[in-house]
Amino acid sequence: METKNNELQTVAEAIGPIEFTGLRLTAPPQYAAGVPAVKIALEHAMREMGLAKSIATLSKLNQKEGIDCPGCAWPDPDHRSNLGEFCENGVKAIAEEATNKRVTPTFFEKYSVKEMSQWSDFKIGKSGRVTHPMILREGDTHYTPIAWEEAFEIIGQHLQLLDNPNQAIFYTSGRSSNEAAFLYGLFARKLGTNNMPDCSNMCHESSGAGLFQTLGIGKGSVTLEDFQYADVVMVMGQNPGTNHPRMLNALEKCRQKGGKVVSVNPLKEAALVRFKNPQEVKGVVGNGAAISDFYLQIKINQDVALLKYIMKRLIEIEQEEGNVIDWDFIRENTNGTENLFKDLSQYTKAELIEKTGLKVGEVEPIVTLLAQKKKVIICWAMGLTQHKNGVDNIRECVNLLLLKGSIGVQGGGTCPVRGHSNVQGDRTVGITHHVSPKLNAAFERTFHFKPPTLEGLDVVHCIKAMYEGKAKVFMALGGNFLSAASDTNYTAKALQNCDLTVSVSTKLNRTHLVTGKTALILPTLGRTEKDASDGKSRFVTVENSMGRVHRSVGRIAPASEHLMSEPEIVSRIAKSYFKEDFSIPWNRLGTDYDFTRSKISEVFDGFKDYTERSKKSGFDLPNHTRRGDFSKLPGGVAKFSINQLPDHDLKEGEFLMMTIRSHDQYNTTIYGLDDRYRGIFNERRVVLINPKDIEDLRLKANEIVDLKSDYNGVERKAENFIIVPYEIPQGNLASYFPEANVLIPNDQFATISNTPISKSVRVSIVKK
């Protein structure tokens, strides 16, 4: 194997191949799940894991004392199904992690970094589990094996050579456990930096910011049980059939109890039309259950306009008939109502409706419904958060709920539906670039050092710092940072500017191939795998989307004897850096998870008797908003807010594009090449467009085009996309990420939250 020549690792491709894989189109189905979902899920499991391992993992998936799914953060019901408490994409996530495929030192000897970078993200991910710690030394073309101790020593040396701790960046993926994330945050603070960007910066940061400003807590207020008591559930900017399939059970139960479901989405998603529950007879041999009573195919990012229209109409009906707005709740628990009414008065209903692209007749039934009902849940995901005005979108949802008095009541409240399985837990246990004097004091009290007080860097700003040479070491606790971030080429250059990049990973991904001068892959245990120390079994804990903390216990043998758990990896790095400083017992923290949890309980409220309470069903963390308590806010009341209509400043010929996932995808992990629920098969390089727009542009279905964005005079291009006619509002486009991420500038992000504008990118279509 040739390891050193003129072919440096910097020639690695940031973007995969732009060839096509053979598009096949069908009419989108009118339902989700059912027998096809079971069949496809089991085929995937058998192909990746085989029979024995499939039984061992799936029988324990999301069960009490079992494996927490590494996919989404949707909560588990108190009473688990004996037929299996998982969904199609949960099975895919487990199969992806527990695959029998292996990426060994021989694999790395065979393939250079350059060659692997020319593969698709799908092919890279399907290579398998990394079995040994690997290093790409400066100037080398191939990764080579490295002993764990040497890897830790290299990281420690690079950190010691920094001019100051803020030249280091510690990124966290939502797959990491509470225990690992806590130690990671402790290490960064002890080192002296708050540079702790995490994946939530790119997704639900807008949710946390909007909710914290208005309600005093950055988490949702509802529980899973609330769905059975809700009069109305609004699902906005979210596609549960692909991203949170078990949520469909909750929506079905809501309707069975007499509740109504209102879906608001630019695309008609099959799962929001009809759901065939494969655990019920009618889901196997019948027609299943309708999910949405009303479906509004709104224009991209016009949710504020819709909500303002609804609130204007509710105020009108209140003035005419009364008993629509909860004045008792408003007087006792809020302020800012007068300013809200004044803001709404400056808009006409006609202009608001025009912005949405909807018709009055489509929206008025929802107005009537909300006027008559009190208990309202609003659910949302990236369709609301990934915009310049993402925080405004969330605050406007809160405005509607406050008008109805539907926060802190059974069957009503906020429901940001989180993506990665422990993204909320990581934040709870201290992964944040923000500075909290209270949190710093707790760390100082527990570990006897003064944490840094300088605000850290979030994702977009850490990329900028690396690009400008102001950050030298980048470490990722899980994730595929390059493919997840916006502005792919810019992000790639940023990573390549680093002296050292470190990835704690289970599987190969593109971030391992576009690296700093030196790069390390540190292979770790997955959720499915047994975690033991000195013969004693250990478990980790996670927090779901609704604030419940519970344990996850691995059940199968590790993919390799050379793997190390995340807490141990973090503690060993810390020990390597701090050497003779024994003020923090890193060894014990990395190996004794009970001890680590005891320290978490000393730093954070709500974790008393952590280890014992996390067993069985787990425990709920304190949530004052859930109780209708807003005392954490100034004045002790919730806040109405004033939010402007978005201005996308589209020029002639420009469209507003949103990046989306396919059904064979979770975050940056590509399970396959199909998007079954949209009738798109064996292809990812597609752009969904309204047939009228195709006609106006004199294009044809299946024609190949390029997509181009232009921000501040800088053009970015994504090449080779196939035109697919689709039911989407005129002027709007949709395309998959990470393929379309190259079009999103790193400096275009949400006000306050700094979340990239991945759901509202100005683009134009360029004919070939």
Regions inferred by a protein language model and the residue ranges of each:
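Cofactor-/ligand-binding subdomain signature composed of acidic, glycine-rich
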Residues: 43-50, 58-166, 266-373
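Long, structured ligand/cofactor-binding scaffold of large enzymes
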Residues: 143-146, 150-229
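Short boundary motifs at domain starts and secondary-structure transition points
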Residues: 159-162, 367-368, 465-466, 645-649
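Long, low-complexity segments enriched in small/aliphatic residues
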Residues: 588-677
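Non-catalytic alpha/beta scaffold blocks inside enzyme catalytic domains
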Residues: 206-399, 403-409, 416-599, 653-656, ...
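Intrinsically disordered, low-structural-confidence terminal and linker regions
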Residues: 1-66
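Acidic/polar N-terminal loop/beta-strand segments that form early-domain functional surfaces
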Residues: 133, 171-173, 658-660
